From Swiss-Prot:
Induction description: Positively regulated by agr (accessory gene regulator).
Keywords, alphabetical: Hydrolase, Protease, Secreted, Serine protease, Signal
Signal peptide residues on this chain, from the entry's feature table: 1-36
pH dependence: Optimum pH is 8.0-8.5.
Phylogenetic placement of the source organism: Bacteria, Bacillati, Bacillota, Bacilli, Bacillales
Molecular function via GO: serine-type endopeptidase activity
Protein name in UniProt: Serine protease SplB
Active site: 75, 113, 193
Length: 240
């Protein structure tokens, strides 16, 4: 994909896909759902991998990258503080992997929309495997890379409050990878910010942060591609 096209699209046609008041879609949800029904799936069991690696914020998504450590977007974490809570892989009223308190927030120093969040190891509300965060979740591993044409999936909590924290999985092809940017054609909505972008082996390719406002067959979504520098930052900030 031409770089200038991507930049113009990001500048003019994208929304940040959390529901924190940063951006709102200009098309009705009914139209979006009809457009995406062939590649969006409701997750039935969040207690199996890869879904055990996903966590919910009040208005967005995150995922586990190591001991007591979650990744999300800067535009998500700026609305949270130490002591606030996250929920591990909730499944509406069918339970969750525990509720945990945030103990540290570290934003990536570059322009990329990446933020590390460390949580207290002991749950405020226990999960099915006890009170320990690491017993109730599964960290993701990195993919070797990604390229145009490969299939990816985005797993997260679109419209989390409205959808009662039901987890959804959306799939589509990679359109382009350039530097720390990855563009893909997968349907995402408000609340998907911070969702993991995974390859067919459920390995991390990047983190989702925005999507086009337009609603047609050319609607793209945007993520931060995990470069060696970003992986190094994450590794250095995993809880010890």
């Amino acid at each position: 994909m031409n770089k200038n096209v991507v930049i113009k699209s990001l500048a003019a046609l994208t929304i940040l896909t959390s529901v924190t008041g940063i951006g709102t879609t200009l098309v009705e949800e009914v139209q979006q759902t009809a457009k995406a029904e062939n590649n969006v799936t409701k997750v039935k069991d969040t207690n199996i991998f890869p879904y055990t690696g996903v966590v919910a914020f009040k208005s967005a998504t995150g995922f586990v990258v190591g001991k007591n450590t979650i990744l999300t977007n800067k535009h998500v974490s700026k609305n949270y503080k130490v002591g606030d809570r996250i929920t591990a892989h909730p499944n509406s009223d069918k339970g969750n992997g525990g509720i945990y308190s945030i103990k540290k927030i570290i934003n990536y120093p570059g322009k990329e929309d990446v933020s590390v969040i460390q949580v207290e190891e002991r749950a405020i509300e226990r999960g099915p495997k006890g009170f320990n965060f690491n017993d109730n979740v599964t960290p993701f591993k990195y993919a070797a890379g990604a390229k145009a044409g490969e299939r990816i999936k985005v797993i997260g909590y679109p419209h989390p409050y409205k959808n009662k924290y039901v987890l959804y999985e959306s799939t589509g092809p990679v359109m382009s990878v350039e530097g720390s940017s990855i563009v893909y054609s997968a349907h995402t909505e408000s609340g998907n910010s911070g969702s993991p972008v995974l390859n067919s082996n459920n390995e991390l390719v990047g983190i989702h942060f925005a999507s086009d406002v337009k609603n047609d067959d050319n609607r793209n979504a945007y993520g931060v591609y995990f470069t060696p520098e970003i992986k190094k930052f994450i590794a250095e900030n995993i809880d010890k």
